UniProtKB/Swiss-Prot annotation:
GO terms assigned for molecular function: ATP binding; choline kinase activity; cholinesterase activity; ethanolamine kinase activity; identical protein binding; protein homodimerization activity; protein tyrosine kinase activity
Reaction(s) catalysed by this chain's protein: choline + ATP = phosphocholine + ADP + H(+); ethanolamine + ATP = phosphoethanolamine + ADP + H(+)
InterPro entries hit by this protein: Kinase-like_dom_sf (IPR011009)
Protein name: Choline kinase alpha
Major localisation: cytoplasm
Gene source species: Mus musculus
Post-translational modification N6-acetyllysine, affected residues: 243
Deleted gene: phenotype: Death at an early embryonic stage. Embryos die after 3 to 5 days of development.
Domain of life from the UniProt record: Eukaryota
Subunit record text: Homodimer. Heterodimer with CHKB.
Cellular compartments annotated: Cytoplasm, Cytosol
Pathway this chain belongs to: Phospholipid metabolism; phosphatidylcholine biosynthesis; phosphocholine from choline: step 1/1; Phospholipid metabolism; phosphatidylethanolamine biosynthesis; phosphatidylethanolamine from ethanolamine: step 1/3
Taxonomy of the source species: Eukaryota, Metazoa, Chordata, Craniata, Vertebrata
Length: 453
């Protein structure tokens, strides 16, 4: 789960790739050019023919040491009194039945750890309060994170630019809530119980989030592929131009180039990352992806283990045990990014409880065999006639897709690397954002070496 951050003029898309004033339907395009809160400074040529099978050489040792496994999280962690009071009032005012007469001393709330963007809480009725009707007894309270603090990252900009930032931030949240409601109505996501400027109340689904290691389990990987293919097949009433990816990276990069840290350690970390000549790298990446075929579909854009629920009671089901959640980055985008981004997430564990609160291991990137397993499950769901193709046609399709997603994995590293630098400045979530940015750019250059680009 990662926090949105947007800048730019009125003609640019929000981080969701959406414009309230934009309409029209754009056909899928052949290429880019042809169409994870307590420390503010805690901080090829176009594919006309078939390509040879993409060989992924053995990766080098991981750039970061692997700390010991995390200790169990604290139980029933409580929010600060002001947050508790606001949560109580939201639940009392938005939820029906027994919630309406609930006293504050009867209100139960606990912190849900693990979000890198938003603050999450479980709110519930006590066992002593009987239900009146079919009202939920537990709900999830989501409070928006650093997107509400965008001004602080652009203090030197014009008042007009700051106002545009604030408008686009508010627009993004409204549109994400609209998207959330649509997916809920289609039974593709949790129900929406209430929405307000600071966040929303969602259905609390008995479940747990996947662990990073579970992404590589064959049955889990196959179902994620099927869920993603279904997501990609949806028709949504949003801007269908694939502007989100490079529009967002350009905005992040502009912010990063203007950032100033007061802590010397952060200054040195930023200096090291800027020595990579990020503007030139971004243009090289754009040139590479311009000649990489990838259909434009409705993408999740953040399909990591923390955004995939394992449903309680469905653990032994073959194909109905998972649910995708957290759609704040969803937009029409290149398919290769969504899948490549998911593959990148195999390398990162965000559950480590000591600084920098994540572990990275490049060796965990899926092997060619694991990628083909995912791609086969994806194509069987996404492409109705895939299984009727000849074995030669299936092979060629999968080889093209291997090249597609591994190239777009570069964009994943670049995007979240920039994102993390911005978060180091504006986020109040306790996380080693600068260390994470460094890890993503190290992985970016490693992926370039593997691909020979």
């Amino acid at each position: 789960m990662k926090t949105k951050f947007c800048t730019g003029g009125e003609a640019e898309p929000s981080p969701l790739g959406l414009l309230l004033s934009c309409g029209g339907n754009a056909a899928p395009t052949p290429g880019v050019g042809q169409q994870r809160d307590a420390a503010g400074e805690l901080e090829s040529k176009q594919l006309g023919g078939r390509t040879q099978p993409l060989a992924l050489p053995p990766p080098p040792p991981p750039p970061l040491p692997l700390p010991p496994p995390p200790s169990p999280p604290l139980a029933d962690e409580q929010p600060e009194p002001r947050t508790r009071r606001r949560a109580y009032l939201w639940c009392k005012e938005f939820l029906p039945g027994a919630w309406r007469g609930l006293r504050e001393d009867q209100f139960h709330i606990s912190v849900i750890r693990g979000g890198l963007s938003n603050m999450l809480f479980q709110c519930s009725l006590p066992d002593s309060i009987a239900s009146v009707g079919d009202e939920p007894r537990k709900v999830l309270l989501r409070l928006y994170g650093a997107i509400l603090k965008m001004r602080s990252c652009n203090k030197e900009g014009s008042e007009q630019a700051q106002n545009e930032n604030e408008f686009q931030g508010a627009e993004a949240m409204v549109l994400e809530s609209v998207m959330f409601a649509i997916l809920a109505e289609r039974s593709l996501g949790p129900k929406l119980f209430g929405i307000f400027p600071q966040g929303r109340l969602e259905q609390f689904i008995p479940s747990r989030r996947l662990d990073t290691e579970e992404l590589r389990l064959p049955d889990i990987s196959a179902e994620i592929a099927e869920k993603m293919a279904t997501f990609h097949g949806m028709k949504m009433p949003f801007n269908k131009e694939p502007k989100w990816l490079f529009g967002t990276m350009e905005k992040y990069l502009n912010q990063v180039l203007r950032l100033k840290f007061s802590r010397e350690a952060r200054v040195q970390q930023l200096h090291k990352i800027l020595s990579y000549n990020l503007p030139l790298e971004l243009e090289n990446l754009r040139s590479l992806l311009q000649y990489t075929r990838s259909p434009v579909v409705f993408c999740h854009n953040d399909c990591q283990e923390g955004n995939i629920l394992l449903l309680e009671g469905q653990e032994n089901s073959e194909r109905r045990k998972l649910m995708l959640i957290d759609f704040e980055y969803s937009s029409y985008n290149y398919r290769g990014f969504d899948i490549g981004n998911h593959f990148c997430e195999w390398m990162y564990d965000y559950t480590y409880e000591k600084y920098p609160f994540f572990r990275a291991n490049i060796q965990k990137y899926p092997s060619r065999k694991q990628q083909l397993h995912f791609i086969s499950s994806y194509l069987t769901t996404f492409q109705n006639d895939f299984e009727s193709l000849s074995s030669e046609e299936q092979f060629a399709t999968k080889e093209d897709m291997l090249l597609e997603v591994n190239r777009f994995a570069l964009a994943s590293h670049f995007l979240w690397g920039l994102w993390s630098i911005v978060q180091a400045k504006i986020s109040s979530i306790e996380f080693g954002y600068m260390e994470y940015a460094q890890a993503r750019f190290e992985a970016y250059f490693d992926q370039k070496r593997k691909l020979g680009v």
